[in-house]
Amino acid sequence: MRFLFAFILLCSPWVSEASQNIVTVKTIHEVASDILYDNTNYWLILDIDDVLFEGAEALSHSSWFERSIQGMRALGASEKEAWEAIYPEWLAIQHQGSIKQIETAIPLLITKVQNQDKIVFAYSERQLCAQNVTFEQLATINLSFDKPNLPYASLPPSISFTKGVLFGAEIHKGLGLQLFLDAQPDLPEKIIYIDNEKYNVMRVGEVCNQKNIPYLGIIYTAPKYLSPTYLPDIAKVQYLFRQKLLSNEAAALLLRHRLDK
């Protein structure tokens, strides 16, 4: 009898784990139809940097920020110390710089999913102080997440959900979304998450697993196949003349003629 009870318990849907699927794509076209024709009441969540857009200059690109963090850590700073030291400068550069889309198909996909009355929003590690510049950047590519109408309870002050963007204010993805889900009266039938970093996709998957939410994680590698925007030598020139952020072309011209010396 005990064996029979254990067998029934193991087979019971109430104790089964939610399905998880993680895929890697070079272009959003590879998964667009899977997303659009998914009949579940899912949430589509997208990362911002290097998914919706990337910095158009070497200095405004996320790679400059990441390399700067690595440089400070090599000098003995903790990850938190490096972030706190570099973030204000990165934020100022974002106000000066410009952005460019990675794939024009992504805004089209977002619009189509929104037209299906599905929940679509962005999720970023960006700090709360970066909200204004983030909305300005999204506006330059005519991208809006204003439609989500989620009846969440009050959120902790460490995160913000504004105009359809969840600002996690975190070094690593995961906790911000977990806190947001904790505030929801009802959870989605499924979460589809798109990010260019594998470790972010895995962390969001862990959150979904804890909440028993079926999950499709999409590792978006399209930026790797584009001509690189971040070039260390160009970024150095732009940093020297950062009072007015130079384009990559202008910085390359200065570098070529050694005017940066």
Swiss-Prot record:
Compartment(s) of residence: Cell outer membrane
Record membrane topology: Peripheral membrane protein
Keywords: Cell outer membrane, Membrane, Signal
InterPro entries, alphabetized: DUF2608
GO cellular-component term (any): cell outer membrane
Claim: Cytoplasm is one of the keywords in the record: no
Top-level division of the source organism's lineage: Bacteria
Pfam families associated with the record: DUF2608
Position of the signal peptide: 1-17
The protein's name in its UniProt record: Putative outer membrane protein TC_0650
